[in-house]
């Protein structure tokens, strides 16, 4: 029986195929949702065309299916949500909660990399300008279900951050908040590399008058050099063969109790066993290398 009161999601960007680090986020969010008898949605965050790889979105969906991670409902494509983002921007403008900024990146770098509110009172128009939120009540900390209370960097928390870019693209923080609210997401399970923008996203929820979801930030998978596995670091794509060895490596990475039975289970049986025995308290907080996957991928 599905618990409609719990809605989780996995929201990859189509900048390349899924790799082991992506699988950690997908699997962790999937197991958390299914262990709560909840809904698990997939959203493709295709709002940054210069970073997108042709065909990557379709490949990602095939990879999820191949690894037994079957989602609920229709895929939400951010490229089809521009009207919703424009409406959100217009509402913030009407409420005097945003302003146009013409400051070049070089100026912000010269003052230390954190924006100082220079354009907040200058009444610029939209031409060749970004849109920034007016940070009246910054969020200085948030509670992570896995990690406890997390303190924000005060300078970043207080910054009037960009919600609409100068090049006309919608900023990630705006789009993710609007879409998570639209999809009714109650808990976000994702990688620890996204801890930093969380307070900004919660502040947007407050500006809109919406309830923020709960958050769980999973440990990051690192390569042998200690860098996060990522598309930018050329992490190898998930293997196309038998998914079970990689799923087992991912489950162990997430601190789940391995049993000898895992090796003999079919993919669906393995995932159902993992759902039935999912334990958040054994998930490690720190990032680590996964040598089993690294060796298998060479």
Curated annotation (Swiss-Prot):
Binding site for L-glutamate: 9-13, 45, 172, 190
Binding site for Zn(2+): 101, 103, 115, 119
Motif ('HIGH' region): 12-22
Cofactor(s) needed: Zn(2+)
Any matching Pfam family: tRNA-synt_1c
Enzyme class: ligase
Keywords: Aminoacyl-tRNA synthetase, ATP-binding, Ligase, Metal-binding, Nucleotide-binding, Zinc
Residues annotated to bind ATP: 231
InterPro entries: Glu-Q_tRNA(Asp)_Synthase, Glu/Gln-tRNA-synth, Glu/Gln-tRNA-synth_Ib_cat-dom, GluQ/Sye, Rossmann-like_a/b/a_fold
Name under which the protein is recorded: Glutamyl-Q tRNA(Asp) synthetase
Species of origin: Citrobacter koseri (strain ATCC BAA-895 / CDC 4225-83 / SGSC4696)
Protein's gene: gluQ
């Amino acid at each position: 029986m599905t618990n409609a009161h719990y809605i989780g999601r996995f929201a990859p960007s189509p900048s390349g195929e899924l790799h082991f680090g992506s699988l950690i986020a997908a699997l962790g969010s999937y197991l958390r949702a299914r262990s709560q008898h909840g809904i698990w949605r997939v959203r493709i965050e295709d709002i940054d065309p210069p970073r997108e790889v042709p065909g990557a979105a379709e490949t990602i969906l095939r990879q999820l299916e191949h690894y037994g991670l079957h989602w609920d409902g229709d895929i939400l494509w951010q490229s089809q949500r521009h009207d919703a983002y424009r409406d959100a921007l217009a509402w913030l403008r009407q409420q005097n909660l945003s302003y146009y900024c013409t400051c070049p990146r070089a100026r912000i770098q010269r003052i230390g990399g954190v924006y100082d509110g220079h354009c907040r009172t200058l009444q610029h128009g939209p031409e060749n300008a970004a849109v920034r939120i007016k940070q009246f009540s910054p969020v200085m900390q948030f509670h992570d279900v896995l990690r406890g209370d997390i303190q924000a960097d005060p300078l970043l928390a207080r910054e009037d951050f960009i919600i609409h870019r100068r090049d006309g693209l919608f900023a990630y923080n705006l789009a993710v908040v609007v879409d998570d609210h639209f999809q009714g997401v109650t808990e976000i399970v994702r990688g620890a590399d996204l801890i930093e923008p969380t307070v900004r996203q919660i502040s947007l929820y407050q500006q809109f008058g919406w309830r923020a979801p709960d958050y769980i930030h999973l440990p990051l998978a690192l390569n042998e050099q200690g860098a996060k596995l990522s598309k930018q670091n050329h992490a190898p794509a998930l293997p196309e063969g038998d998914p079970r060895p990689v799923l087992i490596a991912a489950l162990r990475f997430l601190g789940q109790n391995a049993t000898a039975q895992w090796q003999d289970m079919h993919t669906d049986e393995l995932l159902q066993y993992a759902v039935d025995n999912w334990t958040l308290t054994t998930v490690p907080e720190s990032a680590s290398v996964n040598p089993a996957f690294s060796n298998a991928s060479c």
